[in-house]
Each structure stands twice: as C-alpha cells, then as structure tokens.
Swiss-Prot record:
HAMAP family: IHF_beta. It comes from the Bacteria. InterPro entries: Hist_DNA-bd (IPR000119), IHF-like_DNA-bd_dom_sf (IPR010992), IHF_beta (IPR005685). Keywords: DNA recombination, DNA-binding, Transcription, Transcription regulation, Translation regulation. CDD domains: IHF_B. One of its GO terms (cellular component) is chromosome. One of its GO terms (biological process) is regulation of DNA-templated transcription. The keyword Iron does not apply. Heterodimer of an alpha and a beta chain. The keyword Oxidoreductase does not apply. This is Integration host factor subunit beta.
Length: 105
C-alpha cells in the first residue's frame, strides 16, 4: 500500500473528509512519527506494532562494482516489529491463502 492508497482509503472510510484533509491527516501522522524516531523515541501502536531504532556499528564493506574495501560509518536504522494481533492476522490470512492454492493447484 502506498501513501496515496492510504489517503484514498481514509477518504473513502470517512466521506465527511475531503481528500486534501485526508492527505493532511496522513502527512501529520507520518511527520510526527518520523520526528519522534529522529529524537530517539520509541513508537508503540497497540495491536499494530512498534517502531524503534537499531544501532549498526561501523564496519568495513565492499564496493560491489570494484570490490574495493570501503568504511561504512555507524548509524541508527528504523526497525518495525509487528504486534501480536497483526502477526496473527497475517499468519491466518496466509494460511488460508495457501490452503486455497493447494485446493486449486
């Protein structure tokens, strides 16, 4: 799902919202989440999942074209962990999909 699709679904679900208002709501939420992560804060949305930062130490990597060794500096990367309800929903959905594939396969 893209940001545009999310905005469209929000506008469909809430007809009283104009498309530009739905777009603004999505933008405000995503900006707030990005700023929170940039401050090093953890984001938890119960039933959906949590976002936090993982530390990656510096290391020696390789340039894929030349094979030359390259220093890769330390960094923090965003990490998402799905909540229990989401994991269960995804798992049951894929199990049903696999059963349908086997039945028609």
């Amino acid at each position: 799902m893209t940001k545009s699709e999310l905005i469209s679904k929000l506008a469909e679900r809430f007809p009283q919202l104009l498309a530009k208002d739905a777009e603004l709501v999505v933008k405000i939420i995503l900006d707030a989440m990005a700023k929170s992560l940039a401050r090093g804060e953890r984001i938890e949305i119960r039933g959906f999942g949590s976002f936090d930062l993982n530390y990656r130490p510096s290391r020696v990597g390789r340039n894929p074209k030349s094979g030359e060794k390259v220093h890769v500096p330390e960094k923090y990367v965003p990490h998402f962990k799905a909540g229990k309800k989401m994991r269960e929903l995804i798992d049951s959905s894929h199990k049903q999909h696999n059963l349908l594939d086997q039945a028609t396969g």
